[in-house]
Every structure is written in C-alpha cells, then in structure tokens.
Amino acid sequence: MEEEESLEGIISIDESLITSRLSQILDDVLDDRSSSHSVEKLKDVAVKYLQFCQFQPTLLDKLLSKYVPNLASYLLKVKNIGKCNSITVILYQFCKIRGYKAVRVLFPVGVQYIKELYTLLNESSNNTWHFHYIVLLWLSQALNTPFPLNSLDDSLDVKKTIYTIAIKYLENSGIDKEASCLVLSRLFSRDDGLDLLLGFLHHCESSWFKRSIFYKIGCLFSLSSFLKICPRNDCLQTVDVAFQFLNVAREDLVGQENSALRKLLCKCYTRLGIVLLPVNSSPNWKYSISNPDSFFQLPDDSNEEVHIYLEVIVDFLLSSVSDIDSFVRWSAAKGLAKIISRLPWNLAEQVIDAIIELMTENMFLNPIENTVNISITSPLVWHGAILFFAKLAGAGLIKYSKCLHILPLIEVGLSYEVRYGTRVTGQSIRDASCYFVWSFYHCYSKSAIEGLQTNLILCLLQTVLFDNEINVRRAATAALFEVIGRHASIPDGLSLISHINYVSVTDISNCYGDLCMKVAHFPQFRSCVFQRLFTNLQHWDVKVQQLSAFSLRQLSIKYPKELSIYLPPILDYLSVGNADFIFGYTIGLASIIGGFLSISFPFDINRIHDLLSHKNLLSLKKFSRQQQTKIILGILKGIQQIFANDIRVDRAFFSEAFSVIIAAIDLQEETIIKDISDAYSVLVKFDDMEETLEVLLDYIRKCSTSKEARIVYIILQNLPNISFRYQKKICKLLLDIYPQLHSIDYQAPVANALQNIIPFTYEKTESIEEFVKELLQVCSNYLTDTRGDVGSWIRKPAMKAISSLLVKDSSGKKLSEDIVWCCISYIIRQTFDKIDSLRGLAYQALEQIRVHYLIRRCEALTNIINRIRNNPNMDGEVLNELNISLLEIPNLRLQAFYGITVFTADGFGSDLAVKCFEFYLSYVYQLEDSFKKSNSRYGKRDLLQLYIDILSSEDEIARFYFPIMKSFTSLLAYGCFTDFQNVKGMSKAIFIVQRRALTCKSPGGLSAILELYRTLFLSKNELLRHHALKYTANLLLNPIEKVRYQAADTLLYAKSIGLLTFLPNELNQKLLTLDWFVPVSQNATFVKQLRNIIQKQIDKLIADR
C-alpha cells in the first residue's frame, strides 16, 4: 500500500522521478544480498512503474543502456530460479515498451556468451516463456560475433546444436517462437550457416502440409528475417530453393484463412524480389526536388532484363493488394513500391497501369451529370491500390503522365462510400486517400504539381468538413496542413487553417455548422461547400441529410443570391423515384426557403407548390410503406421550416400542407408522431378559420380504436398557446373519451393534452367546474404493470394542470371553495407519492398556488408552504414534520392520512419512508384518547375510527387498502390503541377484511391480513381474539401453499401465547403434525372441526355478554 501511494505521488509530481525510482529498484535487484522473495516484490513494483512509460517509451533510453547489460550478465551467474524469473520479466517489459530491436543491441556480445546461452537453454530447468524469450533474443544478438562457430567447442557441432535448440520453438504459439526465428535468421546469415538454411528450406518444403499453423508462421518469419539481414551475394545462392519453398507455401494458402501467413508470404516475396534487383539495376528516373523537370521527363525504354522469378513475385503482390485483411494489403502495397523503386521505368509503368486497371474495373462515368458510379467496385482493391500509390508518392516514384490518371482516382477515393445492405464500406479508402495527399505534397515541390492541385484540394477540404468518421476528418486535416504548409500558393490557405484543427473537426455538428460558415466565407471555397452539401442531401443516412439541411439554412441566410441558383435543379429532383433523394431534397429545399423567408429575401412561395404534392408521389406503387413514411417525414420537416416564419400564404397552399398532416396521421407510424405534432403546431397559427381543429375532432370521433386516435391526442397535447374557439369542445371531447380508453399508452397522451388545454379553457369559459371535476377523476390513476407505476404518467400532467388552474383561479375566482379544496387535496396527496420526481413536483405546485385566496386564509397551510420554500434542499426531517402537520388541517386531513399511511405502510422500505413512519408514530403517541385533552384537533379515537371506516369499506382499491391495513397493524403492534378499542367497529372491520381475503389472490395481501390477525391475538378483548382465530383458520384452506403455511404458523403462535387452551388434545396434536403443503382437500376435515370449536367459543362469549 505504501508503494502504491508513493507511486501515485511520483506520477503527480514529475515523470523524471519515475526513472530515478526505477534506477533504485534495479540497483536493489542486482544486489547479491537481496533474497528471492524481495527481488520478486521489487520486480512487481518495477513493472508498475514501467507501465507509466508506455506513452513515453524514450524515458527508458538512459536506463536501458546502463541496466540491460548488467541485468543480462547477472542472469548468467544467478542460480536461483525465482531471481532468474524476476530479471527476465523486467527485461521482457523493456522489450515490450521500448521494442525488442532497441533492447537487443544492448545485450553484451562476445564469443564466450554463445556457449553459455545455448547451454543455459539446454540445461536450465526454468520453463517460463519469458526466460526462453530473453535468452533466445540475447543469443540472436550474440551470433553476430565474427568468429567461426566450430572454434567454440571441438567436441560439439555448435551450429547444429543451436539449430536444434531454436527449431523446437517453432511449434510454440507464444512470443518465444519469435525470438527463436531471430536466432535462426542470424544463424543462417553467417558465412558458415548457409548450408543450414538450404537444409531447413528443404525440410520445411517436404513436411509443409503436415505442420501446424504455428510452425508455418515460424518458418516464414525466419526466412523473411534472413532475407532482410543477409548480404545480397549470399542470398543469391539460395534464391532457387527459397523461391521453390515459397511457391509451396503459396499453394497452401488456398482455403487458408490465416492472415499472418499471407502477410509473411508478402514479406518473403518482396524481400526475395529486392534481392533479385540490385539497387543500380534501373536508371535514375525518380523525382528529385533539386531537379523539378524530372517530374515531367520520361526516360528511354530500357532493354535490361529482369529475373524470371520477378514476374511471379509481382503477380502475387498484385493479387495480395486486394486481400481481405488490411495489414496484408498494406504489406503488399509496401512490397510493390519497393520493387518498383528498383525496376526500369518501362516495367514500373506496367505495374502502375495494372493497378490503375484494377481500380477502374466496374467503375462507370455518367457523362450527363459528370459523376462516377463506384457502386460495384471492390473496396478492397481500392484500399490496397491507394496505399500503393501513397508509398510511390512518398518515394517520388510517380511521373506527371501517371498523375493525370491517379489524381482523379484519389479525388473519388476522398469521398468513396459504398453501401451493401446495412453495411457501409469506404472509411479505410478515404483515410488512405488522405495519406496519399499527405505523401504527395510532402515529396513533390510546389512548381512541379501546381497545375494539378485545384480539384484535389477542394475534394480534400470537403472531406475535412463533411466526412462521417472522425479519424478520416483528422487525417484529412493533417493532409491539409501539409498542403498549405509546403505550398503557400493556395489562396487564403493560412487563414483557412487558422479555423481548422484537430479539435474543431472532432464534432461533426461543428463541422456542418461553425466551420462550414467560416470556410464558405472564402469565395474560392464556397462553391465546393455548396456542391458537397447538395450531394449529401442524397445520402442514405438521415443524420447526414439533416445536418446538410441545417447547414444550407445557415448559408441561405448569409448567401441567399448564390444559393437561389440551385433551387430549380432541386425542384427537378423531387420527381425522381428514390425515397432517400426525395426526403433529402425536400428538407434541403425547405431549409433554404426557410432561410430566405427569415431574412425577407424576395421569393415566390408558390414556386414550391410541388414540395407539398405528396399525393402524386405516394400513389406510386413502387414505394413501400417505409419509403412513404420517409417521404412524408421530409415534407413534415419542410412544413416546420417554412411555416415557422411570418409569411403570407394562399388558402390552397395552406390546405395542401394540412393534407400532408392528415396523410401522415393515416400512416399510423409511431416514428413520425413528434414530427406530425411539431408540423401542426407551426401550421395551426395560420388557421384563422380554425377549420383544421374541427377536422381533427371529427377524425377522433370517426376512429374505431383508440390506437388510431393516439396521434391526434399527441397533436392536441402540443398545441401552442393561441386563441381557439374550440378549446371547450376539445376539453369536453377528451374528458368523454378518457374513460373509454383501457390502456395507459392511450390515456397518457389525453392527460398531456388536457394539461395544456384546460388552463386555456379556464380563460374562455365560465362553466369550468364540470371539467375540473372530471379532471380530478382522471388524475387518480395508480395503475402498475411490468413497467412500474405507469399511473404516474397521468398523475404528473394532471397535477401540472391543476396547479395552473389554481394559479389562474387566484384572480379569476371561477371555482367553488369545495372544488378548490379538492384540487389542493390532490396536490397534498402527491407530496406522499413514492416517486421522487412527483413529490418534488407536488412541492413546487404548493409553492405556485400559495397565492390563492383560500390558502392565504388558511394560516396552517400557509406556514407549511413557507417552510417548504425555506427548505430548498428538501431536508427529509423537515418535510416529514410538515407532512404530519397536514393532518391537522380539516379540509386536507383525509388526503394527508391516505398519503402518509400508503407511503409508510408498516414502517419498512426506503430511508424516507422509515423516517416518515417514525414521525407519524410519534404524532400518534402524543394524541390523547380524547381530543379535548390533547393539543391536536383530533384524538386517538378519531384516528382509530378513520382506520375502521377505511378497513370496513368494500369499495376501497387494493393499492390503498393493504398499505393502510399494514399501517393499522403496525400501530396496534406498537400499542397505540391498547387502552381502548371500538369492539363493534373492529369486528365489522375484520369481517370485511375476511371477505377480502376470500377473493384476494395476492400472497402479499393475504400475508398482510394474517399479520393483522396475529396482532389482534394480543388484544385485550377476548371476542376480537376469537374472531381473529376463526378467520385465520379459514385461510388454512387457501389454494396458495405459502399462505396456508403462514396461517398454520399464525395459529401456532396463538397456541404459544395460550389462546388455544380450549382445543381438545387430538386437535392440538394434529395442528402440530399436519403437512400444509399437501392438497387442500386432505386437511379439510380438520379445518372444519377447528372452525366449529372456535365458533362455539365465540357464541359462548356473545351469550355471556
């Protein structure tokens, strides 16, 4: 723990302290006095420190040069396996973070180490992979020693020994195989090791198809490493054998899904091809920045012949350029570029032409629109080919004549996107195209490519602004920086990149918004921005279409004249048979027009009548329901854009817009309900005659099901606050319809509509009370289902409506006092709701209605509301105290009682419910038996009578009945009503409870009833005790096993406290031994006998009285 705390402190102070702490730890590791256990602990701490160097691996450079040789030397002399493992783990972490190439060269090299290392591998009992990895890595470096291996030990063939040791690791799947491949490649590259290579290749070729995939990867990795480090003249001696082996491996690729094999095969073929082509085999035809003319000059054809194997190698790499795995394509592209760099120009040109031909296969040009169709091209080919071109550009291997063919393809690649069903490809191609642009401008001078760059820069800028992928936008930004930084000829380039950076392109909304406006400020870039936005209106992604429409609206406000030119072509596109196009161009056109109207730009609104001519579009049978929905959605969004402005439209145009809304309602699509509502909310402001409302009301009346009318309810719920003549009619219709709805999903929109309409209706009519009474009936919804308390979907808007009414009534005074107190009582009831948001809303409502004249007359309620206002943090104890105080207000007492008892029930549950019950219990304790002896308006007898009245009610809904019963049971158990009991009233109450028990199917409700009976066993009244015994016995025949078991347990409790002494011994014995989990019929006789005996006792008690 102390190490972890100090580590955290070091990270927060200075990174340099990490290296100093690591240095101390490594010194302790190298100390001979350190035990194996302490070294292992130090290793764990060192690894933790090393993890923090992963993002800055160069921090380790000073440590590596000092400690790698020391740790390696210490590894040879240490005998303890634990210490050995700790050292190799630290060395492996160095390799992992800094790279094995940087660590390997630091191992001590000498002829004496070779024998020690292979002996250590042979004789050591250490089987950990990191030990073998480090020793093999060191051995691969030690083999650089320029001495014949046979001179090390006359008794052994050292080469064979090392070869045998290394070859056995090729079957492993771990990282130690990689180190063994490095050993083999170093061994083969020695002057005295070529014979081993030939034997290795022959052996691999003969047994290739029998070997595991790990062995094959090891063989190819060994060969590729050998071809990389071995001198060319030595490699030429093995070309035939290596080529034959690679052909065998290539044949094995058929049906092979392992991408690592294909990548290694690309590497091997590439390095073999480089061996076959000397550096000076071709004239110097590459571009040189010191000779700009070299970009345009073509060298004379060369008659120089190349090796016959090269054709096979190039053919394989060309096929690998379109491999299914990206890193295989990348390896093939790099390999081809390296080979081309050594080919004569006439041969290099053939390879480049072959790649261009692969790209243009299945690509078609539309001469009318001057666009390219790439829908059936291969994205794999395009990605590999562009990576190949990028490597050529970075090396200066592209001539002017080829640029004329390649750059148009790169321009297409910058916006390449093809959709296959639900899958979209093209992200990697656009990213590779940005890499090409970066490489091209990084290598070539301004004077060389100045005439080629115009379209390329515009396409790049479009990618920066409008690409969907953040990594592509950032890659395009990097390329743009390279273009402008190296080629200052671009107009306003520096001003442009002052707005564009890696952070600003992170948010795509910012790209379409702020950045788009800033780029469009430069006239030379404005046209390309417009064109790409209009192209994006055809995009399949709705989000892209909407962002483009938003951007066009912003631009239409600032550049109305330039954008007005594009309107006629857009209107033509509305007649095409593509739903995506129609949707995009509809919202785009509406956004532009909305921008024009917002700045009063002169525009004839009737020119876009076709925008609302949905009937002609939707009548076409080729549109599916989903496509029709999308077209309607586009028109709805267009209505929102156009009618959101203060414009004058003729009646025909308005009627056409309203017919779109009716058509959208008829579709009955849930996904566009909000858009229908929003469109009508802006359209209704132009309905001076208010005819549309009458149409909607008729639509509701004609609907055969509530599902069909649900959309209209939602429309009415979102109506704006404007003058309507139909408010009273709407209100009446909704209140009449509500009782007929049997699903909360349809009731909730009606309640929300009433929330908005009833307060407006208050201002327009004098007879508002009938609506308020019906609203109070609507709002008492406590329905629950699998989604939880869905009744809150009704109570919340109803409470908002009631609070708005009371605020208006504070000055209007249209409501009677009884109705007002009912409304206040409803809000009071919600202050005890179990949903936190509803309770908070109820407290807010109380604060809003405090201005009502009736509340101002009630000093107690006013004080409560003021204390709530002074308690903005809603402190639990204060609120509970205030809630209990509501019981003292006569007009609110019943609702407060319901709220408290239902919320707290038996005093268990949430912390808030427990606290509230404690306050309620203390309130009951302080009540006297008679209110005349108490500070309260009410006494315990009054409270007891209230409980009895509710428990005696057969109409009370179960949601309230059982929590109130639990509350009553808890108060009885706490002895609140011990000194007096209304026997007659209690007897009636528990009789009604018993009747409920006979019809109750809820185990929770029956359990609450049995708890009440158990509590009554402690009553001082003997008659009540026997009634409770009888009713408990009745539940012994309940069909629910759990209830029967609890009833039997309750009777056993009665027996334990001496209430069943009158039972015969036989029945007492049966009560103890009967199985209550068997079918009911088996115990029916016993239960009947038990009930009869208890009834006789009851009759006797009544007779005695």
From Swiss-Prot:
It is found in: Cytoplasm, Cytoskeleton. GO terms for cellular component: cell division site; cytosol; microtubule; microtubule cytoskeleton; mitotic spindle; nucleus; tubulin folding cofactor complex. GO terms for biological process: cytoplasmic microtubule organization; microtubule cytoskeleton organization; post-chaperonin tubulin folding pathway; protein folding; tubulin complex assembly. It comes from the Eukaryota. Glycans are attached at residues 122, 126, 373, 721, 883, 1083. Keywords: Chaperone, Cytoplasm, Cytoskeleton, Glycoprotein, Microtubule, Repeat. It holds the Pfam family TFCD_C. One of its GO terms (molecular function) is GTPase activator activity. The keyword Ion transport does not apply. Disulfide bonds: none annotated. The keyword Glycoprotein applies. PANTHER family: BETA-TUBULIN COFACTOR D (PTHR12658), TUBULIN-SPECIFIC CHAPERONE D (PTHR12658:SF0). Interacts with alp21. This is Tubulin-folding cofactor D. It comes from Schizosaccharomyces pombe (strain 972 / ATCC 24843) (Fission yeast).
